[in-house]
């Protein structure tokens, strides 16, 4: 079996990141969120947003590639993990590897704690990797408030 390669995202990845993000949310979040919530969440997701995050948004985006295809991506700024999304057809450990790379990047940039707002379906994954629940909150996506859990991990 081929191994994943972790690398920084580049603007040319924006289309793949957008497609992967939508596929992951639609496949993995249904059950934790309604179909209407999911569509509101994804309503404004366009490749330009990912390019902006990489070039002007101050975020570091990392991708996990398998056989030259983006299988997962993570976005981090300072001590905040903004997202980690895995292609449901290509998982096989990509999330775990990408989370470790994001933690390393946060440490390298001086963070002592990594924070995130976990989707309800992702809480078990983050708990398994040492994150602790802090509080329940909401994020606004497409005009809807979506429930999330604030979580932290000491690095």
Locate the predicted segments by residue.
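A conserved beta-strand-loop-helix scaffold within acyl/acetyltransferase catalytic domains
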Residues: 74-79
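Conserved GNAT-fold acetyl-CoA-binding loop/helix
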Residues: 22-49
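Conserved N-terminal entry element of GNAT/NAT acetyltransferase domains
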Residues: 1-15
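A short helix-loop-beta-strand connector motif used in the catalytic cores of GNAT acetyltransferases and
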Residues: 45-62, 80
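Conserved acetyl-CoA-binding loop-helix of GNAT-fold acetyltransferases
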Residues: 91-104
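Conserved beta-hairpin
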Residues: 58-72
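A short, internal acetyl-CoA/4′-phosphopantetheine-binding micro-motif in the GNAT/acyltransferase core
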Residues: 84-91
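C-terminal "cap" of GNAT-fold acetyltransferases
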Residues: 112, 116-123, 129, 136-155
């Amino acid at each position: 079996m081929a191994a994943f390669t972790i690398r920084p995202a580049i603007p040319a990845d924006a289309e793949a990141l957008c497609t992967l993000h939508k596929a992951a949310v639609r496949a993995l979040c249904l059950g934790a969120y309604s179909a209407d919530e999911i569509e509101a969440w994804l309503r404004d997701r366009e490749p330009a947003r990912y390019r902006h995050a990489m070039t002007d948004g101050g975020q570091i985006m990392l991708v996990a590639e398998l056989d030259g295809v983006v299988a997962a991506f993570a976005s981090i700024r300072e001590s905040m993990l903004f997202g980690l999304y895995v292609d449901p057809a290509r998982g096989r450990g990509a999330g775990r590897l990408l989370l470790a790379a994001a933690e390393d990047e946060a440490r390298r940039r001086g963070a002592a704690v990594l924070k995130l707002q976990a989707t309800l379906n992702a809480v078990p994954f983050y708990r398994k990797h040492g994150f602790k629940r802090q509080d329940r909150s909401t994020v606004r996506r497409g005009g809807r408030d979506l429930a999330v859990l604030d979580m932290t991990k000491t690095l």
